[in-house]
Amino acid sequence: MSEKHPGPLVVEGKLSDAERMKLESNYLRGTIAEDLNDGLTGGFKGDNFLLIRFHGMYQQDDRDIRAERAEQKLEPRHAMLLRCRLPGGVITTTQWQAIDKFAADNTIYGSIRLTNRQTFQFHGILKKNVKPVHQMLHSVGLDALATANDMNRNVLCTSNPYESQLHAEAYEWAKKISEHLLPRTRAYAEIWLDQEKVAITDEEPILGQTYLPRKFKTTVVIPPQNDIDLHANDMNFVAIAENGKLVGFNLLVGGGLSIEHGNKKTYARTASEFGYLPLEHTLAVAEAVVTTQRDWGNRTDRKNAKTKYTLERVGLETFKAEVERRAGIKFEPIRPYEFTGRGDRIGWVKGIDNNWHLTLFIENGRILDYPGRPLKTGLLEIAKIHQGEFRITANQNLIIASVPESQKAKIETLARDHGLMNAVSAQRENSMACVSFPTCPLAMAEAERFLPSFTDKVEAILEKHGIPDEHIVMRVTGCPNGCGRAMLAEIGLVGKAPGRYNLHLGGNRIGTRIPRMYQENITEPDILASLDELIGRWAKEREAGEGFGDFTVRAGIIRPVLDPARDFWE
């Protein structure tokens, strides 16, 4: 592994322009406040275009009408995506009612998009509504700080509806980690919440004046569920319990899925085990991992700036020893843990506290009133009467949590009446896509708009081969940045060009193996032809309980990725 080829602790060379931008931004202020008042353009200019990402927003435009507007000599229809900070995906029904109203009244698309990072996004916020959205969030105890760009992003936590006490403890740690790693700059409060500037120099004791070299993602995981896909993340705390009570965490570092087409210096990587730590060291260890990456991460090349590349460059043992030094601890040996699945259990589940939890399947996380299926209205009506909370899952679904027996029938009636409990196949429940077109500027191929009809065709293949109740973990991502987490799927499609994808095979159901590229730059008919043949073989030749991804590896159809830094592209 990495120790065979240790590299420098710090990469020397000309810093990327992003580093200049951060340094000159006055702790993320830039000239955003002035830009807000420029009515000549619907977008943000210069450095502000990137700086708003630190405030939880991306500037986008509707790519479906981009060419048409260009012909009319109009600028693109700029609008912002805003992503809320929501550790563990827990949101109150009061907060839900507020975001429902904002989506309806102040966004182009009128939808709420649940993401696979356990939060929600608004798409289509015009510039005039940017400040009001931050103020609305603040009024209900939410914010969008540090949900994008070079910071610790939204902290995920297993949406475990069974063991309520353990989930509550893990969720509290997810919140503590999130708060501890937040930026300290007052820029967010000054710009969006009109808080007074104070005569105190900003300091960033953890993140530093130029923040992190690249995005950084953290999870808290409760085995045996790997619903949050820990191997997609930089830093992972795997909960270890004794007698149902949380006692500590196993730490895994250096996961990440983003690649660049054709760039063999990039690769998807699973996280590496560092060791076990008692609870009282959690925040010190989290800070130590982040500051080590802050100081050692590559600031000359953003394509090689994530923690996974730092770990490979300096060596796992070197990185681990530095974390131990900074945190003032020695990791204990990894404690036993096992993952058995990562899908959500759709429907009602009774928790150990005798409350009920209803997990609703939301295809691709898009909450909108569809013809005959008014999902958004249904959730609003549930929010008006539900005394518990909602939980957004990392599979883009929604849990109506902590429902007392007395409310169960009423909530189920509302859900059914609004199309929120329509029967779907196991295959559809285990399929997921990122947003992609028309709003994502990085999209190379369709994802969210492509997946439903593509799933229909995969369902037909399963039916053809006599296994209609089976499922394959299937993900579509519109570009190699990998937001759809296709690089941890059994079938992963990565957008290459309009209507064309790279097909990856060989991941597994529990999300612990990176799939390898099987075919490159192929169309939907080619993909379906390959899947028809391979699913047919799987149906006939599989061993008892063997998932599709495991079968493709065992049958020699695809070689497993064992050491991504060296064999991902082979």
From Swiss-Prot:
GO molecular function: 4 iron, 4 sulfur cluster binding; heme binding; metal ion binding; NADP binding; sulfite reductase (ferredoxin) activity; sulfite reductase (NADPH) activity
GO biological process, one term: cysteine biosynthetic process
Transmembrane segments: none
Superkingdom of the organism of origin: Bacteria
SUPFAM superfamilies: Nitrite and sulphite reductase 4Fe-4S domain-like, Nitrite/Sulfite reductase N-terminal domain-like
Bound cofactor: record note: Binds 1 siroheme per subunit. Binds 1 [4Fe-4S] cluster per subunit.
Descriptive protein name: Sulfite reductase [NADPH] hemoprotein beta-component
Family matches, as HAMAP family: CysI (MF_01540)
EC number: 1.8.1.2
Subunit structure and binding partners: Alpha(8)-beta(8). The alpha component is a flavoprotein, the beta component is a hemoprotein.
Pathway: Sulfur metabolism; hydrogen sulfide biosynthesis; hydrogen sulfide from sulfite (NADPH route): step 1/1
Binding site for [4Fe-4S] cluster: C434, C440, C479, C483
Entry's family note: Belongs to the nitrite and sulfite reductase 4Fe-4S domain family.
Cofactors, names only: siroheme; [4Fe-4S] cluster
Role noted for this protein: Component of the sulfite reductase complex that catalyzes the 6-electron reduction of sulfite to sulfide. This is one of several activities required for the biosynthesis of L-cysteine from sulfate.
Catalytic activity: hydrogen sulfide + 3 NADP(+) + 3 H2O = sulfite + 3 NADPH + 4 H(+)
Keywords: 4Fe-4S, Amino-acid biosynthesis, Cysteine biosynthesis, Heme, Iron, Iron-sulfur, Metal-binding, NADP, Oxidoreductase
One matching Pfam family: NIR_SIR
Residues that coordinate or bind siroheme: C483
Alphabetical list of PANTHER family matching this protein: SULFITE REDUCTASE [NADPH] SUBUNIT BETA, SULFITE REDUCTASE [NADPH] SUBUNIT BETA-RELATED
A GO cellular-component term linked to this record: sulfite reductase complex (NADPH)
